[in-house]
Amino acid sequence: MNNTYRKLTAQEIETLKSQMCTAVDWNEIEVAEGFAPKYVRWARMSGHIRLGAFNKEFCLPGGMKKHSGIYYATLHNVTVGDDCCIENVKNYIANYEIGEGTFIENVDIIITDGPTGFGNGVEVSVLNETGGREIMIYDRLSAQTAYVMALYRHRPEMISRLKEMIRSHVSSVTSSVGYIGSNVTIADAGYIKNVKIGDYCKIEGASRLKNGSINSNMHAPVHVGVGVIGDDFIISSGSSVEDGVTFSRCFVGQACKLGHNYSATDSLFFSNCQGENGEACAIFAGPYTVTHHKSTLLIAGMFSFMNAGSGSNQSN
């Protein structure tokens, strides 16, 4: 991201005004060298704003091309990197740093509100839905650490030390400013609040994402698809969550796939798990746990290298 910014010139301010742009205080807006005001139209800005240079053209499916810039959007305390396209934001974007080459279109609202750990530090009542074996999720959670925290409750001093280390990580990531990485796509999404989004992530049609981290990167991007509703979560690299999945207080490990209206609460899914159609409540899904069937309900169990068959209903 460009670290060299300057104030707007009087001519640039007049150009922006002629393009129906407004600002609470034009002195609070800084731009990168190479900034061209012609690519900012119908924008409302408040707080401290930083804008990059808009030179890139996005090639969209079907052959459509859109030039980077800001069109029909309201921004408050936002840094926009070079070559981003932000268009048709129904409400506003507030308190975010946005990397380079990111495409945001047709979204309702994207905000960071107050200090947040972005899903880090959330307690998940795994293995016992009434509590007692809670695990604090964080970006680097492993199956081994989670196993010890859940099953070694007879070692309270060790559990206390583990929680201290996790809280230290939570403190290091807690911020009042959210982050959207470089080359991210967010399109046709609804409500996004207190979510950290890594590089090359694609969010397409998600309904609601609240208090979470999506740890995507260039080599293992994350896809969040249509109709997804997520609260208090962490999604690790290379995973996909799509097709109407609803999940709350969940950790999704690397290369996992959740889809086809899967529902999960207070559960941990470690690497290479797959969940479709069914339900999960308070489960510890170790690596390669798979469930495909609508009639499958997994509750308060620990699994690994398992394919749950049709009718695996643990509520009976």
Predicted regions and their residues:
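Domain-scale signature associated with acetyltransferase and cell-envelope carbohydrate enzymes
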Residues: M1-N316
